[in-house]
Amino acid sequence: MYRPRTRRRRWLAGLAAGAVAVTGLGGVDASAAQAAPHAGKDPRLMRILRSMSLQDKAAQLFVLQVYGKSATTAEPADVAANRRLYGVDNAAQVVARYHPGGFIYYGDNVTDPKQLAAFSNGIQRAAAAQPLRVPATIAIDQEGGIVARVQPPATQSPGSMALAAGRSTGDARALARITGSELRAVGVNQDYAPDADVNVNPANPVIGVRSFGSDPALVSDMVTAQIGGYRAGGVTPTVKHFPGHGDTTTDSHTGVPHIDHTRAEWERLDLPPFRAAIKQRVDSIMTAHIVVPSLDPSGDPATLSRPILTGILRDRLHYRGVVVTDALDMQGVRDKYGDENIPVLALKAGVDVLLKPPADAQGNGVFPRQLAAVVNAVKSGELTEKRIDESVYRVLELKQRRGLFRDPYADESRIGQVVGTPEHLAAAQRAADRTTTLVKNGAGILPLRPGGRKVLVTGWGVSTTASLGTEIARRGAVTTIRQTGLSPGQAQIDEAVAAARDQDLVVAVTNRAWDVKQEPGHNGPGQSDLVKALLATGRPVVVVAVRDPYDIAWFPEVTTYLATYSYTAEALRSAAKVLFGELDPRGRLPVAVPARDEPGTVLYPFGHGLGY
């Protein structure tokens, strides 16, 4: 694995090849930093703020998860889940009881674009029926690639690392605009994207291909392009995860990551994309549940760190937009303090929006207690009401900036004219065609000639192997599919090997084959063992890595290796085009690929990529 710190300083320097040195925080140009959105306060927003009770103000700072696919009705299981969390049945009732600032959608909330638009409109109607008539923030994680809550027929953008492999800021902006316009068409007004983390650790279990790469300058360029694209599409972009989640081997969903960068390393590697985003006046920044001792030695995660969020982000970087937490049900923020204390600590640190309160060990929602804790903190003097007002005003101002007070509704009659249009789908495919990276072609197997050869497609993913097999069959091959999953056992490996023996070619699909730990939550060595067993048959083997490009370090003897960075239909079509020479592989690695267990040795450098 890549955990040891031996030779790590040299490794960091190598992975961020080409990174431009940045000045210390004291050298940030205040004239270029984000100015306050308005020189004075907006009278309408101030009237709304003054009309709010303390409870209303505190509730406006929460963005909640709700179960179901409609604002007013829900399946019995969803009703039961909502009752455990909020004591009511559905989203409209949550609005009526608590008046929260907004909601976040997950995949379980989505059936199709028309359903989602109706859901969003139901939430906004419920908000409009309340005395304050404050529209709801409706947010989602729609990063593209492996993180997409809204699936086809919506357009599927290449993910961050794929776009960075294509090196086109034009594609990054265009696909963000398309994604933003399709989200706004279904009533979503905030996207928790783009990801500004600089992924310098191949063993990062939570970021990986969600990052634009290991080079701060490249990441900065792509992030700023996407900020403009999302805004043009009509949604609020949110860069994440400040102060930078790119160098960890711990998933903040399940543990507390520690980032061991020195202050100088942080300024050189992690800071530049966020600084660039602030210069673009990005509307929203999401915090990370990570501990960074060089920035705050207290051991508090950044989400709860006043030195990081106020001392650095507000005071030194002059950020004036909305600060939103990562989800509060993640272990990275729950480990040190009790759930009821976390919102107060986050607000004291400098947070504005509190995302997705958790359930307790009995499955009951903590949100009502967290809401009461914020109110009581003001009453006791632990927080001032002025501090709450600052955050509420920023939230209201952002809603106004997105036009929500004017018209928060989706036009349900126009969804088909915006979502998944032929023009949007074609743009996504063109972008994907620029991302596929041919990392190794030592045996000269590629490009393949169309024809009746027998091809085994095996490895990870029922739909992935089937889709890639279909694309190969369209080129005249006779394909056999043997899906083996993330953690193939010996029986599955033996079955794939037996199927390979009478084939002319084997295409093996891998997904994080580097994650070889034999522990719960990890893939184990099965994928690596599968590839090595297939190589031992003597059949020509082409490996297609459909997630992290680092897999080849676990089977460096493979002669032919492609990286697609995701497994969308567009990515797999592009891979097939490259396999058969219909498309010259244009992608270039946006990260370096180090040797297994030798992070100081780079197998394939940043920028590597072969052509025909």
Placement of each model-derived feature along the sequence:
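Solvent-exposed loop/turn segments at secondary-structure junctions
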Residues: 67-71, 108-112, 142-147, 190, ...
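Second-shell residues forming the walls of enzyme active-site clefts
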Residues: 48-53, 77-83, 87, 112-132, ...
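Preference for extracellular/luminal or secreted protein segments
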Residues: 2-5, 22, 33-93, 315, ...
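Short acidic, glycine-rich surface-loop motifs adjacent to enzyme active sites
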Residues: 59, 65-71, 91-113, 202-203, ...
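Active-site-adjacent structural elements in enzyme catalytic domains
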Residues: 110-135, 167-187, 386-397, 433
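Bacterial N-terminal signal peptides
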Residues: 15-26, 141
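N-terminal export and membrane-targeting signals
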Residues: 1-18
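Hydrophobic faces of well-ordered beta-strands that scaffold small-molecule active sites
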Residues: 59-66, 101-105, 136-142, 190-194, ...
